[in-house]
Curated annotation (Swiss-Prot):
This is Mitochondrial carrier protein CoAc2. It is a multi-pass membrane protein. GO terms for molecular function: coenzyme A transmembrane transporter activity. It comes from Zea mays (Maize). The keyword Transmembrane helix applies. One of its GO terms (biological process) is mitochondrial coenzyme A transmembrane transport. The chain crosses the membrane at residues 12-32, 75-95, 119-139, 187-207, 225-242, 280-302. The gene is COAC2. Its main location: mitochondrion. Required for the accumulation of coenzyme A in the mitochondrial matrix. It is found in: Mitochondrion inner membrane. Keywords: Membrane, Mitochondrion, Mitochondrion inner membrane, Repeat, Transmembrane, Transmembrane helix, Transport. Expressed throughout the plant. Belongs to the mitochondrial carrier (TC 2.A.29) family.
Amino acid sequence: MDARAREAAETSGPGLPLAVRELLAGGVAGGVAKTAVAPLERVKILFQTRRAEFHGSGLIGSFRTIYRTEGLLGFYRGNGASVARIVPYAALHYMAYEEYRRWIILGFPNVEQGPVLDLVAGSIAGGTAVICTYPLDLVRTKLAYQVKGAVSVGFRESKPSEQVYKGIMDCVKTIYRQNGLKGIYRGMAPSLYGIFPYSGLKFYFYEKMKSHVPEEHRKGIIAKLGCGSVAGLLGQTITYPLDVVRRQMQVQALSSSSLVGRGTFESLVMIAKQQGWRQLFSGLSINYLKVVPSVAIGFTVYDSMKVCLKVPSREETAVAVLAEERSNTAPIPSS
């Protein structure tokens, strides 16, 4: 941005730097969206990781099992770690997206202003956020995987189910004690392989869909919810098998998985051979129910928070960045 535009962006709003306001907007959006779909996220993880107690029980049956054995709070098991992860993750993700977008425009002023720019900036931002917050995602999965109390397995008698970790800190300490730093980042490779296309496609489809909405309706909540829903749906469908691989790698120590020590794509092939290709899409229907409101709520809350915190729009940012580039490259008039 030029000096005047930068100063206006930095000082407008509640007296906070622009980057901090972007972090706040992203963090709030992530926390609200994640909590709204926590029960579906819990069941999806149990399906992905093939808990015997939930195999073939379906969505409603799984809800009943969780409620019977763990009560209402069982639907939110692991959500503390999930929110603890998603708030910094979403904050970094959205802020990094805005920053990378500005850097690309500044570094390549001739680049086309459109969804392709959002695809590139979103992909890099997603990778940045994953690397910074992955340990909390691992903890969230391990806490959600364990089931408290006795559960019924088919026609067999109820049996106690293991509860290895007592909470977030206990989980982190146990993982580090048993496997060191490597254990804390187990399964990050498929996360990165998945997040680069998913994050990029999510921003790409969102901005692409918004570009087809009439200008007078573009800032409405309904339009944002609709565009966000389609963006999340398409992005998740394309990258979902890698999410299944990641979950199974994360809980392999608890489930005696044959994936121990194997790479991402080797694990992908093994799951398809041993568990069937359908397992690569296990929980996808639940994920559709989760992703549609989650991404829609996330984008809507983020855009609304940007308005409340007076964060410049992407169009205003692009104009300011290009103005700065022109001012820096303008020839100095001769005296």
